Swiss-Prot record:
Source species: Rhodospirillum rubrum (strain ATCC 11170 / ATH 1.1.1 / DSM 467 / LMG 4362 / NCIMB 8255 / S1)
Keyword flag tRNA-binding: no
EC number(s) reported in the record: 1.6.5.2
UniProt entry keywords in alphabetical sequence: Flavoprotein, FMN, NAD, NADP, Nucleotide-binding, Oxidoreductase
Protein name: NAD(P)H dehydrogenase (quinone)
InterPro entries hit by this protein: Flavodoxin/NO_synth, Flavoprotein-like_sf, Flavoprotein_WrbA-like, FMN_Rdtase-like_dom, NQO
Pfam hit, one: FMN_red
GO cellular component: membrane
Residues given in the record as FMN binding sites: 13-18, 82-84, 117-122, 137
Cofactor binding: number and manner: Binds 1 FMN per monomer.
Lineage, top ranks: Bacteria, Pseudomonadati, Pseudomonadota, Alphaproteobacteria, Rhodospirillales
Cross-referenced PROSITE patterns: FLAVODOXIN_LIKE
An MF annotation (GO) of this entry: NAD binding
Length: 202
């Protein structure tokens, strides 16, 4: 067994907000000695024509994950935009394929965390909780974000992110990008999560 703790940052992004947070979180994970991070996406199921119609990004170059490889990691951080207070269908579809891993207990005892993006804030926490219920059914250990960075207390500007997980406000038209404070919280989440995953692995 390797002494290295392996963490997967797995995400779905339509307009780039989650992609930005995922990279910040991965950078935070990488700051912890003895922890290796992988950054991957779940497959897209919408047609190229429809994605073009809604002006979604299609230029992401992050590798696509397979369901079976989840068992190879000691911790999994999942990022998904909010869809009516729930995770995006693309992430839902991917997680619905983990029944085989569940049947064999392959994810029991591993660390799990999540992060999200919403238009104006509605549904952020329920989206994160919709991810966490999957972790609990798999016997994983849910890891949130403690109030361990000043940005978690900052109310000087509109921002997202809290103890449930890092988040960003995209604005009604998606034009707002993650702020410096939101990105700092995301990086802190990655760093904190990596430390917990490392301890759980022992």
């Amino acid at each position: 067994m390797s002494d290295t703790t392996k963490v997967l940052v797995l995400y779905y992004s339509m307009y780039g907000h989650i992609d930005t947070l995922a990279k910040e979180i991965a950078a935070g994970v990488a700051e912890v000695d003895g922890v290796e991070v992988a950054l991957k996406r779940v497959p897209e199921h919408m047609s190229a024509e429809l994605l073009s119609t809604i002006h979604a990004r299609t230029d992401f170059d992050t590798p696509i994950a397979s369901v079976d490889e989840l068992a190879d990691y000691d911790g999994i951080l999942i990022g998904t935009p909010t869809r009516f207070g729930n995770m995006a269908g693309q992430m839902r579809n991917f997680l619905d394929q983990t029944g085989g891993l569940w049947a064999k207990g392959k994810l029991v005892g591993k660390a799990g965390g999540a992060f999200t993006s919403t238009a104006t804030g509605g549904g952020a926490e329920t989206t994160l909780l919709s991810v966490y219920t999957n972790f609990l059914h798999h016997g994983m250990v849910v890891v949130g974000v403690p109030y361990g960075t000043p940005e978690m207390f900052d109310t000087s500007e509109a921002r997202a992110g809290g103890p449930y997980g890092a988040a960003t406000l995209a604005g009604g038209d998606g034009s707002r990008q993650p702020s410096d404070k939101e990105r700092t919280i995301a990086r802190f989440q990655g760093r904190h999560f990596a430390g917990v995953a490392k301890k759980l692995k022992g």
